[in-house]
Amino acid sequence: MRKIIIHVIILFISTFSYGQRLENLIKIGLENNPEIQKFETAYKGVLEKKNEVDAIPNTQFGFGYFASEPETRTGAQRFKLSVKQMIPWFGSITARQNYISSMAEAKFENIAIAKRRLIASLSQTYYNLFTIKEKQEILKKNIALLKTYEKMALTSVETGKASAVDVLKLQIRENDLEQLIEVLGHQFLSMQTKMNTLLSRKKDFKIEVLDSLVISSSFDTIGADNLSLHPELLKYDKLYKSVEQSELLNQKEQKPMIGFGLDYVAVSERPNMSFSDNGKDIVMPMVSLSIPIFSKKHSSKTKQNKLKQEELLFDKQIRQNKLTSMLDTAINERIAAKISFDTHMKNLEKADSAEQILLKSYESGSINFNDVLDIQELKLKFQMKQIEAIKSFYIQSTIINYLSN
């Protein structure tokens, strides 16, 4: 087993160290991940809507030609030109902008959530790769140790202190461990493919992992209060705010729209007549109001907004309960991983002592190779469980980091 560093440090979850190689992988993943890019594009699309809602209604132009020219005192009317512009009630455009801004803020939280999830997935995959590689190294060292025992057994066979069966048992054990190394090799390739998929690159791109990981013996106290600023919950707050802005916009849309216009009528001169207004064109400024008399649509919208807010509060509570449960589980699982690591470290020390006793027996002229195999198997079991404890410790720390920062 490679050197496992046991160092008393305080693991600040807000500055959890992933190791330089993992940090580089995370940087690559954040730059290339299509899901993050999708949410960023959606966010930009909502922001662009602000330019759309800034616009006022289209200006109306009209032209009319009198097929039968009506006679007036000043002459016959020939054609009519008109222009009209409706303007929303005061504050309506601002209300639309505020609504779009609130929607954009909610969309932005999707980016933060996607980034957190990607970091967590990359980290967990990385620690799985570390575990597989570390197990392979442990098995290789155990095989080397078994080969040493095999040589000892062959020497004992020559002196009549061991049988050929002992040698065969050791060789069978070596074959079993070599088979496990091969299986782990395929598992590593599978996990490497998963990592490269998360990084949006070719599946056979080689991943390098750390040779050792630091395991902490003390941790910060983490509670449910740490969840308050989690983007999965902030998203509900911002969606709630967007519904509030939607209702303010709904109230503005119940107000009348003001219209300003101008009519121009071309008038022909009356023949054989002379007076000051003969043929004088008509110019008529106009003001109009568009009033939503039937407001059932807006009343329904108000009720819908209220129900939507209630739904969001329930959704937030459900998600908060789930995240709280996840955090509590991760905290306790991490503590359990540390306990398991310490226990297996003690067991390894005992197994090493037993192994030394057996080796001294060999020096004195006798050794029980069945006991050797038993001790070797025990040591391998403790080493494997210790690696699993390290993996669990870091994976649970990743979950805590995802939830509490």
Regions found by a protein language model. Give the residues of each.
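Bacterial Sec-dependent N-terminal signal peptides
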Residues: 1-33, 393, 400, 404
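Periplasmic alpha-helical coiled-coil/stalk elements that build and connect Gram-negative outer-membrane
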Residues: 3, 117-231, 330-333, 337, ...
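Bacterial Sec-pathway N-terminal export signals of envelope proteins
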Residues: 18-60, 86-87, 95, 161-165, ...
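Small/polar (Gly/Ser/Thr/Ala-rich) solvent-exposed segments
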Residues: 37, 59-76, 86-113, 253-283, ...
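Amphipathic alpha-helical coiled-coil segments
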Residues: 38-50, 114, 118-137, 148, ...
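Outer-membrane beta-barrel "beta-signal"
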Residues: 80-84, 283-293, 388-392, 399
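Short, charged, amphipathic alpha-helical segments
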Residues: 101, 164-172, 303, 369-377
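Membrane-embedded hairpin module used as a gating/binding unit in multi-pass transport
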Residues: 194, 209-213, 236-253, 257-263
